Amino acid sequence: MVNKIFIAIIISILVSFVISPMAKNIYSDPDLSKTSRKFDGFTIDFRGIDTPNSTYWALCNWQMDLTEFKKTYPDATGGGAYGGLQTGINVKKAIMSFWEIHYKENGKDKILRSNRIYPKGSESTFGGEGEGTNYISNFNWPTNVWHRFVLHSWKDSSTGKTFVGEWIQNLSTKQWTLFAYFNTNLENSYITGGLSQFQENYNANYFGVERSFQIKNMCL
């Protein structure tokens, strides 16, 4: 890790919304003012306590640094990313997603997308709040058990591109799982941005129920 800065945070939030058809999001924004804001890794411990259907816990929202890319394409925008854990309809999942990077080349609009390297398979894309590439898959993480969520970026030796991976550890069994990693198709990039978290009810059919979670032990 670039910065061995431990942020002792534990948040326990209990939410019940019985009027609004969509539960309001709950955000956590770490104070990064005393860091370099240039990271090759991020970890956070998470425990879901009340985990009803259609809940998403964003464990890190970050930005891929575009400094090197903007030397050639100064108008480039985008490059956000996020990862976390989710409940679907009676199923649990994990997520890793990268938004597109938009730029112009010889006056023409261009798009740079991240490519999934692991696990192998056809590319999955998403729309709605912007467009990009993602991987969402069943991941049976147990309720009321602490999990360690880890992001790591590195320069791939064969391509020279910046790769980013997502690992999840069950802290009860000590078992690690490599969930996914992507080629960002950027060079000399790294993890930056706000590194925020949030809880979201994304399906109006499942409002009005309690949702609670805890987070602690952020490390950059």
Indicate where each model-derived feature is located.
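Positively charged n-region of N-terminal signal peptides that target proteins for export
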Residues: 1-4
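Flexible glycan-contacting loops in extracellular carbohydrate-active proteins
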Residues: 179, 183-209
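Secretory/extracellular carbohydrate-interaction modules
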Residues: 22-121
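Short beta-strand segments enriched in hydrophobic/aromatic residues
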Residues: 46-50, 100, 153-155, 170, ...
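Short, aromatic/His-centered strand-loop micro-motif at the edge of beta-sheets
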Residues: 124-148
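Carbohydrate-binding surfaces in secreted/extracellular proteins
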Residues: 141-178
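Bacterial N-terminal signal peptides
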Residues: 8-16
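Exposed low-complexity, polar/acidic, P/S/T/G-rich flexible segments that act as propeptides
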Residues: 207-220
